[in-house]
Amino acid sequence: MRLDENEGAFTIPEFGKIQFEGFCRFIDQGLMEELHNFPKIEDTDKEIEFSLFGNEYELAEPFIKERDAVYQSLTYYSELYVPARSIRRNSRKIQKQTVFLGNIPLMNSHGTFVVNGIYRIVVNQILISPGIYYRSELDHNRINYIYTGTLISDWGRRSKLEIDVGERIWARVSRKRKISIPVLLSAMGLNLEEILDNTHYPKRFLFLLKKKERWEREEYLWSREKAILEFYKKLYCVSGDLVFSESLCKELQEKFFRQRCELGKIGRRNLNQKLNLDIPENEIFSLPQDVLAAVDYLIGVKFGMGTLDDIDHLRNRRIRSVADLLQNQFRLTLGHLEDTVRRTIHGATKRRSTPQNLVTSTLFKNTFQDFFGSHPLSQFLDQTNPLTEIAHGRKLSHLGPGGLTGRTASFRTRDIHPSYYGRICPIDTSEGMNAGLVSSLSIHAKIGDCGSLQSPFYKISERSREEHMVYLLPGEDEDEYYRIATGNSLALNQGIQEEQITPARYRQEFIVIAWEQIHFRSIFPFQYFSVGVSLIPFLEHNDANRALMGSNMQRQAVPLFRPEKCIAGTGLEGQAALDSGSVAIATQEGRIEYIDAVNITSSINGDTVRTESVIYQRSNTNTCTHQKPQVRQGECVKKGQILADGATTVGGELSLGKNVLVAYMPWEGYNFEDAILISERLVYEDIYTSFHIVRYRIEICMTSQGPERITREIPHLDAHSLRHLDENGLVMLGSWIETGDVLVGKLTPQTTEESLCTPEGRLLQTIFGIEVSTARESCLRAPIGGKGRVIDVRWINRVDDSGDNAETVHVYISQKRKIQVGDKVAGRHGNKGIISIILPRQDMPYLQNGIPVDMVLNPLGVPSRMNVGQIFECLPGLAGNLMNKHYRITPFDEKYEREASRKLVFPELYKASEQTANPWVFEPDHPGKHRLIDGRTGAVFEQPVTIGKAYMSKLSHQVDEKIHARSSGPYARVTQQPLRGKSKRGGQRIGEMEVWALEGFGVAYILQEMLTLKSDHIRTRNEVLGAIITGGPIPKPDTAPESFRLLIRELRSLALELNHAIISEKDFQIDREEV
């Protein structure tokens, strides 16, 4: 337990604080710790000594801005300098120099890294904490229970101790091989007397030893050498006689004890606490005393004198943050540096080498480049919207090195554990194979020094009944002794609380007790949930599965042309926008002197502060990042005031969608199965119009025939394709690009023989005698769906690792996408759907005041999905729209009184009806429902319909990026069937379910064409294409398709020959032919 520094003060912590604290811990502690552990290096003759002064390291200012690093595809880093000293003992000469070790990638203000121009983020990993854990499990016969103790090292390696049904104790060295504990203890250096003196159950231990074979008792308990030989045989499955040697002992020490038994500081602390040991924390490897104490505790567990561990409890888990991951990479790099210096220092005795000559800086660059480029926990930052960036930085992953995999993780591991309360969100997780393996931190959770997850609670004093905020660890104290009141008690005042029966959590169960017995209480209703879930209003009325979908789909919402803040929210929208870094904030109090679209200049006590705005910048996911000034020239601003809104913020609040008028009713089957029909107003008024910026790149390489050239003079291309190129061969800014247009003209040199190999080259040479060009065009063209406006062109020159000059051209194209049929829209409650039809405004159902509905949703999507929160959201949305009001509603308002949500919604509708003089807004006979009029006929619908203003978002699943068609394309080499997917120019593939659908309609000939002629019949499919073009009949094949030939070949590989026989009607002669 830890008392908070700001005792009594309550604020929601910054959402990116987890990442910032981790990186600062790496810079302040991790670097110094690893540099301090760097050993002194001497040559074999001990004439030269090399050492580093780790306490005096320095990090230089970055030589490039973060924004320039993105545009130039560079890494945003700082240079690490460390003083080094070399001593020559013969000449007694001491040299001390500041050496350049390498580049350390820096974290930016968003908690991310820029590596090779790409934003990346390091995800926190949740692992089993190193230590020993005792469990009971069924034996291989699934009849009897055996008791095991699993020792987990700092790197995730496991060693298991077990007591079998015959009460014999074993140590598992692999899944199939095990060794008896007396042999292991003797190999580690203990004799029988030391074993019996340091155990709590010496009689029980002797009783177990008597069950061993006689030869084992007598030989291996008294001879360490024989025990080591026996251990070596079991470990490596060696048969025959072995001779003891120190090299064999050293190999056993390095391969087994050093790799499997490295506990680390956290593991040593856990082991001391579990086994009641008093071993210093700097002893990071397991000792014979540890194994003996673990066996002793295992005997106690076997006979009911110990406790079994819950491996899924958070007290047995730890968080490996960005600090730990970067420190591991830094440790590996220093190990490589040590080896390099040792090799270099041997040849440095004769020549006068300085510390700078002994150190190479490429090791750091390569190591960190490999880590950020290929490590599973270094991920491509999802920048669809600001909420996505926040949620990505607060993820917890069970996957990665030392963790689990999607195939091996059990249901128990994926499930929600009671210890997650207030630490890990029980709702927000991935869908699919990674469900339960990728979670999200709760809003108030923080990571402790030892990697444990902490959650704040108010401690209630028994004497004064005062409250102090403390952070609780997920340890035994909380589970065994403390009673924690849930959020229901927040509404009670002091006088009522003492007489109130309160729901609480005690020993991982929920109970109801008197308020006097409460030790802690929750501090906030949002405490248990992640950021995305906390943005869902009326969350308590939704099923958890739909709340999960709503949280995930908020992160898929694209920034809109004109964003709008929600009418019904939760109150966290402001902090989400602020912590995301998408808004520009005044750093100090001052007065705005100058403002334009790019810069905002303010004066503070005569000093000028210039704030740069982000203008049409591309994100990792091709969405548009933009800032709009919100202050005026001459206006006085205060510190922390918003100067410019982002692409998804309005007034400093996160705005991911639009408030549209929705009706829950069926309409001619067009909203069947979650389909959605919308009004054309959403298209023509750019309600759901979004901007996307796509980057196309092309490299200029040095070939064996010479360098490639960027030019406008491209032979054999018509002028229409080259119309947008300038004299340098680059596309001009502001050009409107269509599919197939040339963006960058490039010629690649080739030999004359290569030119003459093409049919057109030989034809020109033979008929006209034209000299064939020695270069072929390799231009960058706009792909299918790549039309748009060119907003930027950048020619980047940089030197690669080999020293060559690498040139790259980047072309940025802005695309304006209106909503259309096939796009996906969703609300915040998991109510998602695809646009099925866009109706004219006059055909849409309209209200009694003549306003047509914007969107018609299927009412059957509410009761079966149990996400009634969308109904509670749209009704105050309608009232707020009529009265120009916004509501910020804290979830779980039922703690105030029963039916609190209903009592909030209906009075607001009544007020709106009174203020606007529209009695139809609130009709007592059916409150919340209204009479709608059919726009096509003017007739009133028979049943009243639920109408409201719902907050709907347009998601990144857009039809422009998914629709695909092909007439001909690539085929698989083995099956000769069309490839799959748009990226491979794949074709239509008829699977088993598609065959069933076609069989249901009885279309036998179409089915045969799709399965054979148009698929894998090589000769006939060419003829079919010609017949379709010319309008001729479809030819009938006379040979088998390729898939049937493949089946025959597979049968032949199994030594099964397939033939068919033809029997003549006249003489009944049998003619066998090979298939």
From Swiss-Prot:
Pfam families: RNA_pol_Rpb2_1 (PF04563), RNA_pol_Rpb2_2 (PF04561), RNA_pol_Rpb2_3 (PF04565), RNA_pol_Rpb2_6 (PF00562), RNA_pol_Rpb2_7 (PF04560). It is found in: Plastid, Chloroplast. Gene3D superfamilies: 2.40.50.100, 2.40.50.150, 3.90.1100.10, DNA-directed RNA polymerase, beta subunit, external 1 domain, DNA-directed RNA polymerase, subunit 2, domain 6, RNA polymerase alpha subunit dimerisation domain, RNA polymerase Rpb2, domain 2. Its main location: plastid. Keywords: Chloroplast, DNA-directed RNA polymerase, Nucleotidyltransferase, Plastid, Transcription, Transferase. It comes from Pinus koraiensis (Korean pine). In plastids the minimal PEP RNA polymerase catalytic core is composed of four subunits: alpha, beta, beta', and beta''. When a (nuclear-encoded) sigma factor is associated with the core the holoenzyme is formed, which can initiate transcription. It comes from the Eukaryota. One of its GO terms (molecular function) is DNA-directed RNA polymerase activity. GO terms for biological process: DNA-templated transcription. This is DNA-directed RNA polymerase subunit beta.
